[in-house]
């Protein structure tokens, strides 16, 4: 076990003792899960440690990947179920706009076998490119499948664990905090990385990744009523110029800047 994990566990144990020692006036605990791309999967491990320490969770707030893990946790998924779900996904397919082979016609199957990827051309190409390279429909479908029973517009404060997530409205640059709505839509909006995924259009708003404006939304958890904040920040240090030499490294840097 890494020293950092031991340190976290020790800190959580102290919090647990402090909370359980005051059963009649228990402090409210808020979990804050930052954005951070694929590193956001580390949130699952953090939730396991928090549960093992016996700490009650009263609120969950997340940005980007933190909104996905947090949103699913808030409706009852256990850390073990989340871990299993992440491991069994075909992420190459999910992070693309490919149509499942079973739903393709013959022409689409032939095109899929011929080209590794495609870019939009034609009169709508400029608009699509500005929006993002990936429409994210496969991810949206997954979120919809995982949130069965929560497809209607609902009050997130009435979920098994009250939840909120963060996005940005690029129409005016304002931060948008989702406390109600369709859960899958809120999660998709919170992780719409500019230039990578198309924005989510909702009412008069055009929504992108919440990491642009608030990648570590402690203030949102405080406003919900949390007295104690347990934050999980998985942002990475920025890379120097000589390490930004591939599309993947540049994309990772952009995510970390958010």
Label for each model-derived stretch:
Residues 1-26:
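Bacterial Sec-dependent N-terminal signal peptides
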Residues 20-63, 71-258:
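Patatin-like phospholipase
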């Amino acid at each position: 076990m890494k020293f950092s994990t031991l340190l976290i566990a020790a800190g959580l144990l102290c919090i647990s003792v402090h909370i359980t020692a005051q059963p009649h006036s228990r402090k409210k605990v808020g979990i804050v899960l930052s954005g951070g791309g694929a590193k956001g999967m580390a949130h699952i491990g953090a939730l396991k440690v928090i549960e093992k320490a016996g700490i009650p969770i009263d609120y969950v707030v997340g940005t980007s990947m933190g909104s996905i893990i947090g949103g699913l946790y808030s409706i009852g998924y256990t850390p073990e179920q989340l871990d299993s779900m992440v491991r069994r996904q075909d992420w190459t397919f999910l992070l693309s706009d490919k149509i499942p082979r079973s739903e393709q016609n013959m022409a689409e199957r032939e095109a899929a076998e011929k080209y590794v990827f495609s870019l939009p051309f034609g009169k709508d190409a400029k608009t699509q490119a500005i929006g993002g390279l990936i429409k994210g429909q496969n991810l949206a479908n997954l979120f919809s499948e995982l949130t069965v029973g929560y497809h209607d517009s609902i009050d997130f404060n009435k979920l098994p664990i009250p939840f909120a997530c963060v996005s940005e409205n690029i129409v005016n640059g304002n931060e948008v905090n989702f406390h109600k709505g369709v859960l899958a839509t809120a999660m998709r909006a919170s992780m719409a990385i500019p230039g990578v995924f198309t924005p989510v259009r909702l009412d008069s708003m055009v929504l992108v990744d919440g990491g642009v404006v608030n990648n570590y939304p402690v203030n949102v958890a405080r406003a919900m009523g949390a007295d104690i904040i347990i934050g999980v920040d998985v942002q990475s240090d920025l890379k120097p110029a000589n390490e930004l030499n591939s599309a993947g490294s540049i994309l990772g840097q952009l995510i970390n800047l958010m």
